[in-house]
Amino acid sequence: WIIVGSDDMEPAGSGNPRDNNYFNSSFLISPRGNLVERYCKRQLVIFGEYIPLVKWLPFIKYLTPIDGGFTAGEAATPFHLGDTGIQLSTLICFEDVFPQLAREYVTENTDFLVNITNDGWFGEGAAQWQQGAAAAFRAVENGVPLVRCSNTGLTCLIDANGRLLQIFKDAKGKIYGPGFLRVEIPLNQPSNHRIRTYYNQHGDVFGVSCAVYSALLLFRRFRAQATMDESSESRTSLEKT
């Protein structure tokens, strides 16, 4: 089995090539060379993969370096590796920095996540490490290992606890360079599904609840302070009278 990333195109019913839909996609290919599954990237890079409002403000396209744009995918598509029982989901490019998006890709049957990306446009700076740090949170939030596979950039294995277990480095010790990384990932047992985390099941409910509760406490505090100030002013007025 192999997963590859590539552009994809769906012809428009109108027959006009300008109406075709183009996608940034990942493909699952079987050992026999058959195309088994396709996932289309849902979170596109603004002004990098699409131009917002271009239908209503067409002049915007002249202010960007791209001629057209991709169409966003509509659904999470799990990849099933035939009779092996292995199930995984792919995140493309910077999709691994979006918590709500990543949790949609993980069920009790998901063995691991794969992030395919090209971080070459960052150069050998801190950006790919920052994205790798974000990916670690996605692994912890959903309780699954995550493999980052970069054609240029940080390629690594992150376990379900967010630990960086393996990382690709070339002969010079750099993460940039030709080569490959072989990793071993613990899989679900056929009779034992992975336990879904609280965040995977409920999302930001806890965080939002904490934020609302904090806001209520602040409101109560300010209201009490305002009442005290009014009482103080009233007493001062009476004393003057």
Regions found by a protein language model. Name each.
Residues 1-241:
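Enzyme catalytic cores with a strong preference for nitrogen-chemistry domains
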